[in-house]
Amino acid sequence: VLSPADKKNVKDCWEKIGGHGAEYGAEALERMFLSFPTTKTYFPHFDLSHGSAQVQGHGKKVADALANAAAHVDDLPGALSALSDLHAHKLRVDPVNFKLLSHCLLVTLAAHHPAEFTPAVHASLDKFLASVSTVLTSKYR
C-alpha cells in the first residue's frame, strides 16, 4: 500500500521526468531486452536495435501509461483497466515481465536522476511499480 509520502514521491518524480518520459521508457525497454533476452519474444515484429522507432514508440506508450498511473495513483485499477485487459487477454504477456521492466525503469531513473533517487524515493517508486504490475496482472485470474 502506498503511503501519502510514497504518493508524493511518485508524483514528484514524474514531474521531474517531464518531457523525458518517452526517452526513459525506450531506454528501460532496451535495458530489458539486453538484460533479459527472453522478453524479446513479445516483440517479434519490432526492430529491436538501439534507437529504433518501434522501441521509441513503445517506450512512449510505457511512459504515458505510467504518467497516467501516477496522476491517478489513488485509483490504479480504474486508470489501468484497459491496459490490464490488453496485456492479459490479447497480448498474453507473462506477468514476470512487468517485474523485469520495473527493475529496468528503476535503473534508468537512478542513472538519470542520481541526486533525487534517494532510498526513500527508490522505495516509493518500487512500491508504485509493484502496484502497477499487480493491477496489470489482476485480469489474468
From Swiss-Prot:
Residue(s) carrying Phosphothreonine: 108, 134, 137
Residues where N6-succinyllysine is found: 7, 11, 16, 40
CDD domains reported for this sequence: Hb-alpha-like (cd08927)
Keywords attached to this entry: Acetylation, Heme, Iron, Metal-binding, Oxygen transport, Phosphoprotein, Transport
Any one biological process term the GO annotation gives: hydrogen peroxide catabolic process
Entry-annotated residues carrying N6-acetyllysine: 16
Gene3D superfamilies, per database record: Globins
Tissue-specificity statement: Red blood cells.
UniProt KW Acetylation keyword: yes
Residues recorded with modification Phosphotyrosine: 24
UniProt KW Transcription keyword: no
Pfam families: Globin
Top-level taxon in the UniProt lineage: Eukaryota
Similarity annotation: Belongs to the globin family.
The protein's role, per its UniProt record: Involved in oxygen transport from the lung to the various peripheral tissues.
Subunit structure: Heterotetramer of two alpha chains and two beta chains.
Protein name as it appears in the record: Hemoglobin subunit alpha
UniProt source species: Spermophilus citellus
